[in-house]
Amino acid sequence: MKAGWNAAVGLTIARVVFEPPRAAPRWMQTPHNPLLDTLQPYPFERLRALTKDLQPNPALRPISLGIGEPKHPAPKLIEDALMAHLSGLSVYPATAGEPRLREAICGWLQRRYGLALDPATQVLPVNGSREALFAFAQTVIDASRPGATVVCPNPFYQIYEGAALLAGAKPAFANSDPARNFAADWRQIDDATWARTQLIYVCSPGNPTGAVMPLEEWRQLFELSDRHGFVIASDECYSEIYFRDEAPLSGLQAAVQLGRPDFRNLVAFTSLSKRSNVPGLRSGFVAGDAALLKKFLLYRTYHGSAMNPMVQAASVAAWNDEAHVVANREAYRAKFAAVTPLLAEVLDVALPDASFYLWAGVPGGDDIRFTLELLAQYNVAVLPGSLLAREAQGVNPGRGRIRLALVAEEAECLEAARRIVDFTRAYRA
């Protein structure tokens, strides 16, 4: 099945090189923050450049496993809460959020992790974890200190790197370790780099790997933080999609278990997008060290990032209900149970600890070529792993793997899996 694949597209596989444009005369230049010029193209932008001349097989309906956007229906209780609070349009919201929302968040943290946090000082509502993860770096990074560094897992959620660069810091990367379920190997960061580090982003469960960080690694990070004074930002937005009986450990939970009930130099970010299938709601929270959150609230007060009252009301309803979360998790479990064994026949793939991604190795190790030919011949879109990582310690840890987001309904995910199996059986690496 070769429809849409031609030599011209084949040449594209050689890799798209993104070169900065030649500098225009100053009078023609648009005034801007020069740090914007340090940003890398987003993975989907790079993939669009790779596929711009490609014609997917028109005989097959397109299926996308590329974007991690939940496709399960939004819970009715959230929709009802939004509609019931439209009067909130007529008031300015407080940046710190309404007390009832902070209390609902603390109630969820108590039920989920057994944590007792102060709703007045240890939690802040945010407009989804993405904006908060970015904005937090702008709050805690002191770019005037020589060599300001932000440590990130590799591969990684691209916001971490962008946040570091626009805060005036340099990102440093800890590659994933295939021998440890693709968890980030923090031991790859040397002492000199740790000494310059001001912030580390932890992603647990990981994107794209699904790996959950165990308690012992939290202990090691806390010891490093105490020694060097850096802040830990734990991105936990996939925490409610897991496949075994034991729920993923939170950084906050780990801190309490290790005798750090004040969450010193630690904050955790959680979102309703994946937990409750409401990515358009843009709602989440950050919790942890009260002193850090006081500074973050000051930043957010000027940044104009208050959550609107209707979204706050809907968020209260979401955090107070667990039935829809259990049903959502069961739907993902059913999909992964059906799809993973199929793909394991032809790809290097296994059930992750958590998240809604499969992190699959491809025959021959060329993730770009595999992605393009799969799209051209079978009209299935996936994301090349090399676009989610950076070259570090001489390797790109995403190369040779693809990320598959099993976000659509089970039947569509199964159809995509069958096409991938058929394609891979005929694929010549």
Pin down the residues of each PLM region:
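N-terminal small-domain helix-loop-helix segment of the aminotransferase-like
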Residues: W27-E131, A135, A318-W319, Y427-A429
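Helix C-cap/helix->beta junction micro-motif
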Residues: L54, P58, A167, R227-H228, ...
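Conserved core of the PLP fold type I
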Residues: L89-E223, E240-I241, E246-R260, C413
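A short helix->loop->beta-strand "cap" motif at the edges of active sites that frequently abuts
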Residues: A148, R227-F230, F263-R264
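Conserved core segment of the aminotransferase class I/II
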Residues: Q253-R333, A337-L342, T424
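PLP-dependent enzyme catalytic core of the Aspartate aminotransferase-like
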Residues: P261, E373-V382, A389-A429
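Conserved glycine-rich beta-strand-loop-beta hairpin in the small C-terminal domain of fold type I
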Residues: Q312, V316, Y332-T340, V349-V362, ...
